[in-house]
Amino acid sequence: MKEETIEILFQYRQAFASDDEPLGAIKGHEVDIILNVERPYPLLLRGPAYPASPRAREALESNINELMKLGVLRNVGHTVEVEVTTPVIITWHNDKSRMVGDFRALNTYNIPDRYPIPRIHETLTQLSKERFITSMDSLKGFHQNVLTPHSRKLLRIIAHCGIYEDLRMPFGITNAPSHYQRIMNTIFPHKLSEGG
């Protein structure tokens, strides 16, 4: 069993993170964010940067630099017209920082994606009949969803140090779980719904 697992992992090694590509991208699929509002966009969607303490500013800069290295964010030049900006904040958990976009304003205009999300009790009921269970986790799963050029313009974040464009799906967008579930059901069409 161990040798078979190693052989499968080696055969599909391009599907796993590496030093050369620490964050993968779902190939052949782009996420399109559609808003239920006409241009020019309301001022509500042009949020200013939130005030931040020196500690939070340092953490924001660190988070932004990490996401830029991973190809999740890019700096928006000063000559680019920016119609939508979402402020970001830093949250702390066990002295570790995480940057979070305040997408509440954008989400009010986001057309909901009603793709079904499995309920945990149904999943656990299906799994209870199985003898072996395999668990897989994606590093920064939402960030593996590439955004369309149109969506990138809607998902620009603003901080004290500049304006940045999301190239991948950020956390906090209303439809992110639905998009991700659709991808998982496409990759594993029967395994997620039937067990086994």
Where do the language-model regions lie?
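Extended, low-complexity cationic-aromatic segments
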Residues: 137, 150-153
